[in-house]
């Protein structure tokens, strides 16, 4: 909905962004990484077994000293010591980061056999008769009336069927602010969201042309060099990222 064209590039054409992640995005990515592997991080802090941090060093070329002094680690540990952090990170969880609606779940996709639904979720906490689906957020806090729950509601459809629980709580957790927006769901809501998903799938299949939604964020889009290269000059850090731009595209931008 934000930009159908960017969605097409990523999920239909399966293109990858042409620029490296900027510092802000990398910071957010590392915070997510530490939270998703919080148990391993705790083990390292207890045992000093460096292998427990393999998940982090595979993604970052950084010394142990720099890691221990990093802003990302400080943010995660402060969150872990907060009341909200304790309520999330120390509960029993299951590794269900990737959600795939395969043939067993095709009831949600209707008669379409050529549709795949894949989703990713940061953390799933589990108790006897309920689940918590947790989406960690970095950056600015979003006020409750602006929070959209659609994506996690669709994930909840999968979880109700897989785990046979009576209640699922969706939690959008803003790590740096120790705030959350949450919503509780029951199995009775599945039918509505199942129909909503079917309609979305049908709409995608019937779309002949995905339109661009031009806005002020276009210069930072992963696909700006494919979609409208000249827009990248509107970035304040343009001079710093020019060396990442392929020569033939840079010539078109500069001319």
List the predicted regions and their residue ranges.
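Mg2+/Mn2+-dependent nuclease catalytic core
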Residues: 99-199
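A non-catalytic, helix-rich entry segment at domain boundaries
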Residues: 26-107
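Short microdomains enriched in Cys/His and/or Lys/Arg
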Residues: 24, 232-255
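Polybasic (Lys/Arg-rich)
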Residues: 190-224
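Short, polar/flexible loop-turn hinges at active-site or ligand-entry regions and domain interfaces
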Residues: 15-22, 43, 141-143, 208-212
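Cys/His-rich metal-chelating microdomains
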Residues: 6, 224, 230
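Short, cysteine/histidine-rich loop/knuckle motifs that typically chelate Zn2+
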Residues: 2, 220, 229
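C-terminal, charged and often intrinsically disordered regions of DNA end-processing helicases
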Residues: 1-27, 252-255
């Amino acid at each position: 909905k934000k930009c159908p064209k960017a969605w097409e590039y990523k999920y239909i054409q399966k293109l990858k962004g042409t620029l490296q992640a900027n510092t802000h995005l990398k910071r957010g990515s590392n915070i997510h990484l530490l939270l998703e592997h919080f148990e391993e991080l705790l083990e390292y802090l207890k045992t000093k077994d460096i292998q427990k941090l393999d998940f982090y060093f595979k993604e970052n070329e950084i010394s142990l000293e720099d890691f221990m002094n990093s802003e990302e680690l400080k943010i995660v540990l402060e969150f872990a010591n907060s009341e909200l952090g304790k309520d999330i990170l120390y509960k029993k969880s299951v590794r269900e980061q990737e959600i795939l609606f395969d043939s067993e779940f095709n009831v949600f996709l209707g008669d379409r056999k050529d549709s795949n639904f894949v989703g990713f979720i940061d953390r799933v906490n589990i108790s006897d008769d309920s689940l918590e689906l947790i989406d960690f957020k970095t950056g600015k806090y979003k006020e409750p009336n602006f929070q959209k729950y659609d994506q996690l509601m669709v994930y909840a459809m999968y979880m109700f069927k897989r785990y046979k629980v009576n209640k699922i709580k969706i939690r959008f957790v803003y790590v740096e602010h120790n705030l959350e927006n949450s919503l509780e769901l029951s199995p009775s809501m599945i039918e509505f969201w199942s129909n909503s998903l079917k309609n979305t799938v049908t709409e995608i299949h019937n779309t002949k042309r995905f339109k661009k939604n031009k806005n002020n964020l276009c210069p930072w889009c992963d696909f700006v060099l494919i979609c409208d290269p000249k827009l990248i000059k509107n970035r304040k850090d343009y001079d710093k990222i020019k060396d990442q731009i392929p020569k033939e595209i840079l010539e078109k931008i500069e001319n």
